Amino acid sequence: MSRTLTAIAALALSLGGCTSVGQIPPPKIASGTLHSANGAAVGTVVLLAAGDDVAINVAVTGLPPGTHGIHLHTVGSCEAPGFASAGGHLNPHSMQHGTANPAGSHLGDLPNLIVGSSGTGEVTAKLRDSRATAMAALFDADGTAIVIHAAPDDYRTDPSGTSGTRIACAVLQRG
């Protein structure tokens, strides 16, 4: 857990500019608990305000080793076993999928999560939109979920980067 907080703090500080020792850490915007298709808790998601940006940290345990695509999805619902209730990728600007796509990418496109042989993994990133724009999309009337997929995201194939089956999901809760 301390590694997670250190990673979040480092990203938040790099996004938010200089800070002095002892300054209050960036405020948490939202969080969620990731659950597998069988209902087991397999990780956490934390979103932090970082200046005009939003930092996201995903930390997991008990997932299959390998590289997994992760995305923010349009509906704050995680009905197992397939998590189809989470809808498609969060894409308020109607962009193409993938960070390698020259036409731009979805707000919901995130870096792949690498899970080691122990079943643990962690990734921290910055969302693509400003905090004000991201907040409006994340916390609209039906909310937002984050989904972990069985396969890696290739960062370009529309609409989902060939990431495969949805294996874990969390509904983001404000605060």
Features from the language model and the residues they span:
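Bacterial N-terminal signal peptides
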Residues: T6-G16
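N-terminal leader/targeting pre-sequences
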Residues: G16-T67, L72-G175
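Positively charged n-region of N-terminal signal peptides that target proteins for export
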Residues: M1-L5
